[in-house]
Amino acid sequence: MGEGLLDLRSQLGFYKFYHHNPKNVLIHSIFVPTILFSGSCMLHRVKIYQSISLTAVLSVLFSIFYCLLYLPTGLLAGVLLLLLNLALIDHRVDLTFKQELGLFTIGWIFQFVGHGVFEKRRPALIDNLVQSLVLAPYFIMFEFLFKLGFMPRLKATLEHDLEIKQRNLRMQRQ
């Protein structure tokens, strides 16, 4: 199995290793988009150059990374991020900073509860902050696509890889 930065299997496998409990995956499926949305709203207030926001710059960078991992889903993620940016630019989102911060905070609280209560382990961001933050929305998109029946072989491969990692971890603990 490839372990490179641009290896889809290893990137999704890294994330799945920390997110395999169904209740925690459900929590993440709700609150990763909440964090992405509210964080994007807050970062849209930060202008990098004239009217170009930090959200726009990060969206482009995320989209490029996602496309390099796997073009079809990368394009889908890019379109979703573009739509979010267009909504922000066109002032279709009418939240105060306090509301955005509240959603952002609630999202993170639920993330940590999910890990502590259901996974019973620390979150992935403790081991790799940037990888976790960048991959979280993409992983959730894959989880949604898997639920719809797309890419069954990739889903099975990731589940098989997870079983091997968990078995190795149990053997190390003995």
From Swiss-Prot:
InterPro entries reported in the protein's UniProt record: Mpo1-like
Annotated EC: 1.14.18.12
Free-text disruption phenotype from the record: Exhibits a defect in the metabolism that converts phytosphingosine to glycerophospholipids. Leads to sensitivity to tunicamycin.
Highest taxon listed in the record's lineage: Eukaryota
Chain ranges on the Lumenal side, renumbered to this chain: 45-63, 120-131
GO MF assignments: fatty acid alpha-dioxygenase activity
GO biological process terms on file: fatty acid alpha-oxidation; sphingoid catabolic process
Co-factor(s): Fe(2+)
Top class in the EC scheme: oxidoreductase
Cytoplasmic domain ranges by topology: 1-23, 85-98, 153-174
Catalytic function, reaction form: (R)-2-hydroxyhexadecanoate + O2 = pentadecanoate + CO2 + H2O
TM spans (from-to): 24-44, 64-84, 99-119, 132-152
Membrane-related topology note: Multi-pass membrane protein
Pfam family, one: Mpo1-like
Protein's cellular compartments: Endoplasmic reticulum membrane
Keywords of this entry: Dioxygenase, Endoplasmic reticulum, Iron, Membrane, Oxidoreductase, Transmembrane, Transmembrane helix
Cellular component, GO annotation: endoplasmic reticulum; endoplasmic reticulum membrane
Misc remark: Present with 486 molecules/cell in log phase SD medium.
Function comment: Dioxygenase that catalyzes the alpha-oxidation of 2-hydroxy fatty acids in an iron-dependent manner. Involved in metabolism of phytosphingosine and is required for proper endoplasmic reticulum stress response.
Family: Belongs to the MPO1 family.
Protein name (record): 2-hydroxy-palmitic acid dioxygenase MPO1
Protein source organism: Saccharomyces cerevisiae (strain ATCC 204508 / S288c)
Gene: MPO1
